[in-house]
């Protein structure tokens, strides 16, 4: 399996003026690969019986290769098939294999591809106290707003995501945080020997932007914790397991038109996971993803490069692109991503102010949840079309070659009030 340094898009540290760009791995180097671990993608159209026979063959070939080693083998290479993933028409599995078995798999007529597993990273974010402009921007039709959003009303329909589920594939969620008002749900934890809590903060922060009562776009939506990270990085072995669980849970619960997945993660281009996101789309499920924080073309990132995900770049309050935000033709929409306040780890009322495309993506995931509660959007294509039809064009400065569309929730007015508090 490839260790995709598919990291959480980590939030960026605050400096005076614009947020300093924080480099994150774009291409998998030697240290990003998980030695001896692979993600195997099978060709489409194989019958269930063929898949079973293929896996029996894998076990026998793997064992024969291990037996042929004069000194024997140890470590992950001896494990064999580890986990199975099935998303719509896509069948994959992860495994620990020796080099000879990996080559045998590549020659199998059943196999589409064999990729080393890689590390994946959270999308980075930044910290500064007292900043809440992002929600005001969501209903301002792209007009520049004051940095301190207590000067701007956030206008929204009272349904506000009611009856919709937002799945957050991340570090977990502090579901006891007062911002979630009992709407936080512990879904799936892929990390072995770790509790289903958020010790890192990233997942709770993202969930708060989606559905927090104060900081959230869709203030009545449910948020489901799907833990695939324990710290700032993970591997596709855990990420695919978690994404597979999310797709199955949405499908089994008949929530396809009332659910959205948020991926505030980024790593080197990794086709197996792009294929997984694409197959979820074909199955009727909407995924929103961060563009990444390298200040480069997002086409080289996964999952930003997934063609039918909604890929989100970050914009500042005065409609400029922060230098850290990725860009390019694959970026669908721009949303608030600098100095955004939300929930945090460490207590049921903890908060933090951060920056990064990790913050931009949940603004759009929250908008998707908000629109799903208001309108009949029968498919991911309809969701994407509605979100993009609401956008305000040609406002982002330095958008490079990206589609120049900023997020808007559809409310037709904007007004200023005196500050009511400094929260």
UniProtKB/Swiss-Prot annotation:
A Pfam family annotated for this UniProt entry: Peptidase_S8
Annotated signal sequence range: 1-17
Gene Ontology annotations of biological process type: proteolysis
One Gene Ontology cellular component annotation held by this UniProt entry: extracellular region
InterPro entries: PCSK9_ProteinaseK-like, Peptidase_S8/S53_dom, Peptidase_S8/S53_dom_sf, Peptidase_S8_Asp-AS, Peptidase_S8_His-AS, Peptidase_S8_Ser-AS, Peptidase_S8_subtilisin-like, Peptidase_S8_subtilisin-rel
EC number: 3.4.21.-
CDD domains: Peptidases_S8_PCSK9_ProteinaseK_like
Domain Inhibitor I9: 37-123
Active-site residues, Swiss-Prot/TrEMBL: 170 (charge relay system), 202 (charge relay system), 358 (charge relay system)
Annotated SUPFAM superfamilies: Subtilisin-like
Domain (Peptidase S8) ranges: 132-423
Function: Secreted subtilisin-like serine protease with keratinolytic activity that contributes to pathogenicity.
UniProt record similarity statement: Belongs to the peptidase S8 family.
Protein name: Subtilisin-like protease 2
Organism from which the protein derives: Arthroderma otae (strain ATCC MYA-4605 / CBS 113480) (Microsporum canis)
Phylogenetic classification of the source organism: Eukaryota, Fungi, Dikarya, Ascomycota, Pezizomycotina
């Amino acid at each position: 399996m490839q260790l995709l340094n598919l990291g959480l898009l980590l939030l960026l540290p605050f400096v005076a003026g614009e947020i300093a760009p924080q480099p994150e791995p774009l291409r998998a180097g030697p240290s990003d690969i998980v030695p001896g671990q692979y993600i195997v993608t099978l060709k489409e159209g194989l019958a269930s019986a063929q898949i079973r026979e293929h896996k029996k063959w894998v076990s026998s070939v793997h064992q024969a290769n291990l037996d042929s080693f004069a000194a024997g083998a140890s470590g992950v290479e001896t494990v064999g098939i580890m986990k199975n993933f099935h998303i719509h028409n896509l069948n994959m599995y992860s495994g620990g294999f020796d080099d000879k078995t990996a080559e045998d798999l590549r020659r199998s007529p059943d196999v589409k591809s064999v990729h080393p597993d890689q590390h994946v990273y959270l999308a980075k974010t930044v910290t500064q106290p007292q900043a809440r402009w992002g929600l005001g921007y969501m209903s301002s039709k792209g007009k520049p707003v004051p940095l301190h959003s207590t000067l701007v009303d956030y206008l929204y329909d009272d349904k506000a995501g009611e009856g919709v589920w937002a799945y957050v594939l991340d570090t977990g969620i502090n579901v006891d945080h007062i911002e979630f008002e009992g709407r936080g749900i512990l879904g799936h934890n892929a990390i072995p020997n770790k509790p289903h809590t958020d010790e890192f903060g990233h997942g709770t922060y993202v969930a708060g932007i989606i559905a927090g009562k104060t900081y959230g776009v869709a203030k009545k939506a449910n948020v489901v914790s799907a833990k695939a990270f324990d710290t700032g990085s993970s591997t596709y072995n855990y990420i695919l397991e978690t994404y597979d669980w999310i797709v199955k849970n949405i499908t089994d619960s008949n929530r396809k038109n009332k659910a959205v997945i948020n991926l505030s993660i980024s790593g080197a281009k990794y086709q197996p996971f792009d294929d997984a996101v694409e197959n979820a789309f074909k199955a009727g499920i909407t995924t929103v993803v961060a563009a990444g924080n390298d200040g480069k073309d997002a086409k080289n990132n996964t999952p930003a490069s997934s063609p039918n995900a909604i890929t989100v770049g970050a914009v500042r309050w005065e409609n400029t692109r922060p230098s850290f935000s990725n860009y390019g033709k694959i970026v669908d929409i721009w949303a608030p991503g600098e100095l955004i306040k939300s929930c945090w780890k460490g207590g049921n009322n903890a908060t933090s102010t951060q920056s990064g495309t990790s913050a931009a993506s949940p603004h759009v995931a929250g908008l998707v949840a908000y629109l799903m509660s208001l309108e009949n959007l029968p498919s991911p294509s309809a969701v994407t079309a509605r979100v993009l039809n609401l956008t305000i064009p040609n406002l982002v400065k330095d958008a490079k070659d990206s589609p120049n569309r900023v997020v808007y929730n559809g409310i037709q007015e904007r007004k200023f009030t005196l500050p009511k508090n400094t929260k």
